[in-house]
Amino acid sequence: MKTSNLRRGALMCGAAVTMALGAPTWALAQTAGTVDELVVTGSRVSEASVAIGTDQATATVAITREALLSAPAGVTGLKMLESLPGFNVQANDALGMYEFGNSVSVRAFNFQQIGFLLDNIPMGRSDQFGGSPIYRYVDNENLLRVTASAGSGDVGLPSYASLGPIVSYLTQVPDKEFGGVVSYSRGSDNLQRTFARLDLGEHNGFSGYVSGSWIHGDLWRGPGDIDRKHYEGKLRWEIGEGAITFQTVHNDYFDYDSPSITKAQYAGTAGDLFGRSGRDFAYLGYVPVLPVTSPGITYSNTAYNQYYKQAVNSRQDHLYGLTYETPIGGALNLTLGGYYESKEGYGVSPEAYATSLTNYNNERLIIPGLFAPKGLQYGLSTVDGTRQGVTAKLTWNLGVHALSAGVWLENDDYHRTQQRYNQVGGSPDGAPLLNEPVHLQRNYTSTRDTVEFFVKDTLSLLDERLHIDLGFKSLSVDYNIQGYRNPADFIASRRPSISKTWEDNFLPQVGAVFDVNSRDQIFASYSENMALPRGADDIFSAASPAAPGPEAETSTNWEIGYRANRPTFNASIVAYQTSFENRLQAFAAVVPGSSTTETFYQNVGAVKAHGAEFSGQWKPEFLGGKVYFNSNLSYNIAEFQDNFATFAIAGKRVPDFPEWLWTGGVTFEPVEGAVFNLSARHISSRFTNFVNSEETDGYTIYNAYLDLGDGFGAGPFEQIKARVNVDNILDEDYLGTVSTTTNTPASFRPGPRRTIQFTLSAEF
């Protein structure tokens, strides 16, 4: 590291300490006489050099701990991304807790094309069924930083899901002093959350912490509740200049669903049988009395599927990680990691009597032990599996070269079943009769064996003013699915085994960072990526075994940008062009080598996006260091490049990708121990289908928080704080998450109404 960077880092650390004690940062600068070297931010704004990605060759931004702790207690790590430039995050509720209500898009990519890591442990795929979505694995209170690269993450980060974007979650190391924190939150919709963490302190190089959080609340839309129990732990043993770290996460989650609705249902023009409309459109909290549609079957009416107890989700996830870091000599550093994950869970969805009767008749003469349907069916899907892997990375500083190389190996085994069962009396409120299967739909196992390695060289030239990254990675994923993938497999008495390998041995990444001076940088990058096809299990379950598997989606990403890090402001602006090829789409076509027409997933073309992103923070001196501003602005045009089947979509906008995204906020620290923030988030209109025949309006929501007690202690507690968070202050009524379609009206999840949360915390 250059001497100037060391000096700048030391001054910034000093500034952070002073802010924590309540003294204005600008006063420190004047006293020390080093205002030219000091970057001024605020105690609730991310550290400047981290926030704008200083020294990174790609557009990399971050949320540091100070900003994370200002969010509502219990907010998911995924929803926090909405404060970063370019990330269109939609959530079904204010905390982002409901898993099937979350969506993310950035540049040309969606949630399943983004790579997520926790302390360098790859999260694999983000599917709610069988995947490892990041929001199950973190509590905000334990995070040190969330770093996101919207275009292309570093070539050394392991992921088979990413077509470029990478989001990395880094947790805290255990505190060297014994202590802890407890907090309790109450909020709208009967929300209650408790968090507790105990740091064990350091003893002969050993340190560690354990934490737990317990959250319970009602759905804001309709009957039902959410319940989550979450535990984390970390042990660290420092050995000389190296360290061994063990960490674990356990998550137990249960919730009821809420329905997606069309614009017609939202507007009340769909002729809903129960008179529902607007954003409060929900499942029923009672069993209605409906006309019988099949003689002798009391609960044969299809509308009985609107009872809320027929739509639930439950997940249990366990993750264990072990990391060993050590220097080897004076120039080499080795990092070894291993992890193991196990999961299980289930989901319930209803099936109408008429549908179940047809499926029962199709299978009853082939599969023994089936029972005729009695009414509404209990649809049970179960998931279980394990994921295990190892990572290794070696870095070597050799003159102007900083060399690194590494490997990642992973095995992912996943098992899924799906059956329909009778319920007592056929009633939607009857207990499930798991000894009376009506028909079978799935019982398969899928595996993914991944091998990835990378090599990278960072050259420091021109007296360390120019840094050039030259690297590449090789990725290979062997996939297999075997068993009963769909009802047709049961009917045909077949248990196919289908395999496919996706690999690319040369995926380059090139980047450069040039220091114009000690405050300004220019950066640029180019990268190529390949990813496991999104929803691979669904792809290979959609048709007969004769249908061919698709090629992997691939991408290219170009970026060029500028960063400024000044005494009273910092900013980053980047222009980009990104695309991905071999886009996947299901449609009817003749299966190659036969005359049979089937609907199966095929590679149908490309998506390209271009645009610009700005991120900045400003703390003007003329306001006495008590007020600071932050803002992100993104402009993005994402378009289809090719038609498919009979749909002329070339040149059409990709649905759910807004053209404009803006977030901004102002933070006011009037006195020591008090922080007030007001922020806004605007998303422009979005198309909702491929042919662009429908769109949903843009919206702006305002949020605020008041934090009191910073620096206040009493009795055994070093710090006692109170925080109030208000989300959607003006109670904006809008449609958020979109379930896109090809050429028909889409379905939506309404955005949550105004919510208020109170949190009291104490540290000891």
Language-model features and meaning:
Residues 4, 530, 576, 581-582, ...:
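C-terminal beta-signal and adjacent terminal beta-strands/loops
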Residues 37-72, 103, 126, 148:
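N-terminal periplasmic "start-of-domain" segments of outer-membrane beta-barrel proteins
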Residues 36, 137-181:
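A beta-strand signature from Gram-negative outer-membrane beta-barrel systems
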Residues 400, 461-465, 568-570, 575-580, ...:
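Gram-negative outer-membrane beta-barrel transporters
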